[in-house]
A protein has these predicted regions:
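FAD-dinucleotide binding site
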Residues: 2-501
Length: 501
């Protein structure tokens, strides 16, 4: 019997749990399904399989659940240093919050006005077209330098459907943004400036198809926001920053355009894990996976062994490539696991003790071409006193800062801000820091695909490897953010139920 999603969710059918295990794992702890990775995808897969009567064990190397969902408790309150935003279109995440009794609030992270600092000078975006530094050509000249990468990437996006990025009809676009802009005849300066706001790892390192997948999915959230927007709400056309979505706080069905979980986003994986109980095993780092046609075995660094009729691997490929996998040859999966790059985001979360921008007269927030990347000043809705702020590093700057330890990174960023904005001296108090590339159990904030990799393996890399199925945001097909993790969990669980029916 084949179960589609609707049939599975409505059937309530209990799948028999008396499933054999491979002879090689008879001494191991046995389960119907062993899941590696207790992030959202692993937890949701486990929930779905347990609901259908299967015996599940869920392993994670960390001492906490959640993966890249992480809330840090600070003197200023909880701060989400990983996933945090729940959009109106996040159907699966919204359903999970409702099932676990979690409340949502409109995200309070409106960014104050941006200025740009390029080539040693402050740039007024409104007058950029007439600036002597502007060596762009034609319509390029109208785009502020901190927006040109995302603007030009979106301009040439022909994709309409959520899964078009995987359609071979668009295989010619499995190239870098630099190659695309060169083919389209853009000026050298436009291409150089595009590097500072290019989505993904960078203008050379990320396939345009990977960039466009996010852009197409983002359109859905923006259209939902625009449909509900008040006349004064910020629209995409008015944005003065390339990264960080603008929130329309108007409540539609109890939801703003962007929402946060009360108490921090970690409340969701914690609630999911609590329901699963002792099926979740922390401190279990997989070092070996042995596959056959009848079962699989996971060996952990502490010597413990777990065997299952099926496995689900949800850990990022940046970590899976360190696990010894034995089984039938699978060149597509091997290539994906070995070579898939991971982007980085590094953020320094701070309190701005006084609004120093009132002293120097410059815009509160900054996009720069220097090592600081961006500084986001967050509206406190009064304009006076302390404000929250963030140093946000993506692309080149994020890769560069990852060679520094926390103390050196903090000193670099605060020092660079003071160099550009002397009025900021003494006004910055650090709350917390997160560099995902330096996280030893993640090694990046999200998957990427290099030019050529969509054609090489992205379409087929999610297919099961004998009894091992793949989930995690890196296996997304149509979604992004936390919703992509839940999407992949749903797919992997249904794949296994189809094989056991």
């Amino acid at each position: 019997m084949t179960l589609n999603r609707r049939q599975f969710l409505s059937s309530g059918v209990a799948v028999g749990a008396a499933i054999g295990v491979p002879r090689m794992a008879l001494a191991a702890e046995k389960a119907d399904v062993v899941i590696v990775g207790a992030g959202l995808s692993g937890l949701r897969s486990a929930e779905m399989l347990v609901e259908q009567g299967l015996k599940v064990v869920l392993l994670d190397a960390n001492n906490r659940v959640g993966g890249r969902v992480q809330t840090v408790q600070t003197v200023d309150g909880p701060i989400d240093v990983g996933a945090s935003q729940v959009g109106r279109g996040y159907a699966r995440v919204l359903d999970a919050c409702e099932r676990h009794g979690l409340k949502l609030i409109s995200e309070d992270r409106d960014l104050l006005t941006f200025g740009s600092h390029f080539s040693g000078e402050w740039i007024d975006g409104k007058n950029w077209a007439a600036n002597p530094l502007n060596q762009c050509v034609g319509d390029e000249r109208k785009i502020p330098p901190n927006l040109i990468g995302q603007a030009l990437s979106a301009k040439y996006n022909p994709l309409q459907e959520l899964d078009d990025w995987l359609d071979p009809r668009f295989s010619e676009y499995d190239i870098s943004l630099r190659e695309l802009l060169t083919r389209k005849g853009h000026s050298a300066q436009a291409i150089e400036l595009a590097a500072y706001s290019a989505p993904g790892i960078g203008i050379d390192e990320t396939s345009v198809l990977r960039m466009w997948q996010e852009e197409v999915r983002g359109r859905i959230e923006r259209r939902m926001s625009e449909a509900a927007a008040t006349p004064s709400a910020e629209s995409g056309a008015k944005r003065d920053h390339a990264f960080g979505e603008a929130n329309d706080h108007k409540s539609v069905g109890g939801l703003a355009a962007i929402n946060n979980i009360v108490g921090g986003c970690s409340a969701l994986p914690l609630a999911m894990a609590s329901k699963l109980g002792d099926r979740v095993r922390l401190g279990k780092r997989a070092v070996g996976i042995a596959l056959s046609d009848t079962g699989g075995t996971v060996t952990c660094s502490d010597g413990s062994v777990y065997s299952g009729r099926f496995l689900i691997c949800t850990i990022p490929f940046s970590m899976l490539r360190e696990v010894e996998i034995t089984g039938n040859a699978n060149p597509i999966a091997r290539q994906a696991i070995t070579t898939m790059p991971y982007a980085n985001t590094a953020r320094l979360y701070v309190t701005v003790e006084r609004p120093f921008w009132k002293e120097d007269g410059l815009p509160p927030s900054i996009s720069s071409d220097g090592p600081m990347g961006m500084f986001w000043a967050i509206d406190n809705h009064s304009g006076e006193g302390a404000h929250r702020g963030m140093f946000v590093l993506v692309g080149r700057t994020a890769q560069a800062v990852s060679v520094l330890d926390r103390a050196d990174a903090e000193a670099l960023l605060i020092g660079e801000l003071a160099r550009l904005r002397p009025a900021s001296r003494g006004a910055i108090r650090v709350a917390t820091w997160k560099d995902w590339l330096r996280d030893p159990l993640q090694r990046g904030c999200g998957f990427s695909l290099a030019p050529g990799q969509v054609n090489a393996f992205a379409r087929d890399m999610i297919k099961p490897w004998q009894v091992m199925h793949f989930a995690g945001e890196h296996t997304r097909r149509t979604d992004f953010g936390m919703e992509s993790a839940m999407e992949s969990a749903e797919r992997a669980a249904i794949e296994i139920l189809e094989r056991t029916a």
